[in-house]
């Protein structure tokens, strides 16, 4: 787990200049390239919809950044209250990205909030491999002597194991000698998610958790092969999205990209927005220092901002037993806007209606919740699903535009 000191909310100068970087895959004689990798749907043979504990999801997100999990949230995790139906509900579909590792294709979560590539492996007991595609070191793989990794989260989930160097291919671009963290121990929380075979981190390599020597992320390994050292994310609401590596796809967004400088001193895609607004209300000039994180579902903000939002939601209340703010499912939620320079990044209200507390419940849990005094905000999938976001390692900087 990465320990994060509290960060002061310091405004960063933002601009809305148009990108001068490549806007489509190139076929140069120097073998540089760009590629798009699409997420896939993977259905599992379960009876009824897939469920997940909202308090567990929430507490894991806090712990990921070294935050303190409040007592009421720990209690909600322990009690099992607040089990939500994950979205999208129909057919129990989860969105993952195929990655070929050592000749085996695994379906991984791409996570801009971490820097490890860890996978289910043949080192796990057979019972824990069931339902998963697992990593088997190729004939060209080599084990890194003395290297190990160990992750744990606030909901009690954990994984650990050995480290190999092997061939990793995403969308036709190959990383030779890429560090692959092979799980030999894993908690039930991960085992039970039969859709997911591991994680590919896209934060900065400085926070890779391999010991004694941190390893390089897949992106840092391959970025010199790309037309431009960037990737762009298009997550979708209740639909598969895509990742563009090495180029910006102008067909996927409207208007011009608004750029924000990134502070990578703690290894994250951290930036500062200028303010926010709720519904059709006036913009509030209140700097929001946050992290763009595809590996976190929720948007987690300072209490005063969260409270200001739910004051505009009829019937909303902060329910300790559920782990956070809830409201009647039929409530029409206002949009939430993050102000980035002269650009307004709008989260539609329907994206903020995260899910029912449990199957058949008329009470729903919100996709915007408190950061519990973390000292910075987390802008997860609830925010990202309405945006085309460019993660540009030159600068570094983030570019935002509304999805087309």
Curated annotation (Swiss-Prot):
Gene Ontology CC annotations of this record: extracellular region
Propeptide stretch(es), residue numbers: 21-77
CDD domains listed in its UniProt record: Aspergillopepsin_like
Post-translational modification: Two isozymes of this enzyme exist which differ only by their non-covalent association with carbohydrate.
A GO BP annotation: proteolysis
Glycosylation sites: 140
UniProt similarity note: Belongs to the peptidase A1 family.
Gene that encodes the chain: pepA
Activity regulation behaviour: Inhibited by sodium lauryl sulfonate.
Record keyword Disulfide bond present: yes
Designated name of the protein: Aspergillopepsin-1
Source taxon at top rank: Eukaryota
Domain (Peptidase A1): residue spans on this chain: 95-401
Role of this protein: Secreted aspartic endopeptidase that allows assimilation of proteinaceous substrates. The scissile peptide bond is attacked by a nucleophilic water molecule activated by two aspartic residues in the active site. Shows a broad primary substrate specificity. Favors hydrophobic residues at the P1 and P1' positions, but also accepts a lysine residue in the P1 position, leading to the activation of trypsinogen and chymotrypsinogen A. Hydrolyzes bovine chymotrysinogen A between positions 'Arg-15' and 'Ile-16'.
UniProt entry keywords in alphabetical sequence: Aspartyl protease, Disulfide bond, Glycoprotein, Hydrolase, Protease, Secreted, Signal, Zymogen
Reaction equation(s) it catalyzes: Hydrolysis of proteins with broad specificity. Generally favors hydrophobic residues in P1 and P1', but also accepts Lys in P1, which leads to activation of trypsinogen. Does not clot milk
Compartments where located: Secreted
One Pfam family linked to the record: Asp
InterPro entries noted in UniProt: Aspartic_peptidase_A1 (IPR001461), Aspartic_peptidase_AS (IPR001969), Aspergillopepsin-like_cat_dom (IPR034163), PEPTIDASE_A1 (IPR033121), Peptidase_aspartic_dom_sf (IPR021109)
């Amino acid at each position: 787990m990465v320990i994060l000191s509290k960060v002061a909310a310091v405004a960063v100068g933002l601009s809305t200049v148009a990108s001068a970087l490549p806007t489509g895959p190139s076929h140069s004689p120097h073998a540089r390239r760009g590629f798009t990798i699409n997420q896939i749907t993977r259905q599992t043979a379960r009876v009824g919809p897939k469920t997940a504990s909202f308090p567990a999801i929430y507490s894991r997100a806090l712990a990921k950044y070294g935050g303190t999990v409040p007592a009421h949230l720990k209690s909600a995790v322990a009690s099992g209250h607040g089990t939500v139906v994950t979205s999208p509900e129909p057919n129990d579909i989860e969105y993952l990205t195929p990655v070929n590792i050592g000749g085996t294709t695994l379906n991984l979560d791409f996570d801009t909030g971490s820097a490890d590539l860890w996978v289910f492996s043949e080192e796990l007991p057979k019972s824990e491999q069931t339902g998963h595609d697992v990593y088997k070191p190729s004939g060209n793989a080599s084990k890194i002597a003395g290297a190990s990794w160990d992750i744990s989260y606030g909901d009690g989930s954990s994984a650990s194991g050995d480290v190999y160097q092997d061939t990793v291919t995403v969308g036709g671009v190959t990383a030779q000698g890429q560090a692959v963290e092979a799980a030999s121990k894993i908690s039930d929380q991960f085992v039970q998610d039969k859709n997911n075979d591991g994680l590919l981190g896209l934060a900065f390599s400085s926070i890779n958790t391999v010991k004694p020597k941190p390893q390089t992320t897949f992106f840092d390994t391959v970025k010199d092969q790309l037309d431009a050292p960037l990737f762009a994310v298009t997550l979708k609401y209740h639909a598969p999205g895509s990742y563009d590596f090495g180029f910006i796809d102008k067909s996927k967004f409207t208007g011009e990209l608004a750029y924000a400088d990134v502070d990578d001193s703690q290894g994250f895609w951290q930036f500062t927005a200028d303010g926010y607004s709720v519904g059709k209300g006036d913009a509030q000039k209140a700097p929001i220092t946050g992290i763009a994180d595809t590996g976190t579902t929720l948007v987690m903000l300072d209490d005063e901002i969260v409270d200001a939002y739910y004051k505009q939601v009829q019937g909303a209340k902060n329910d300790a037993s559920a782990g956070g703010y809830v409201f009647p499912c039929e409530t029409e939620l206002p949009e939430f806007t993050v102000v980035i320079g002269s650009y307004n990044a709008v989260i539609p209200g329907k994206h903020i209606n995260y899910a029912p507390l449990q199957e058949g419940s008329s009470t729903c849990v919100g996709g915007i919740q408190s950061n519990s005094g973390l000292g910075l905000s987390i802008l997860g999938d609830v925010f990202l699903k309405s945006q085309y976001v460019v993660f540009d390692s030159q600068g570094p900087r983030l570019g935002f535009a509304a999805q087309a």
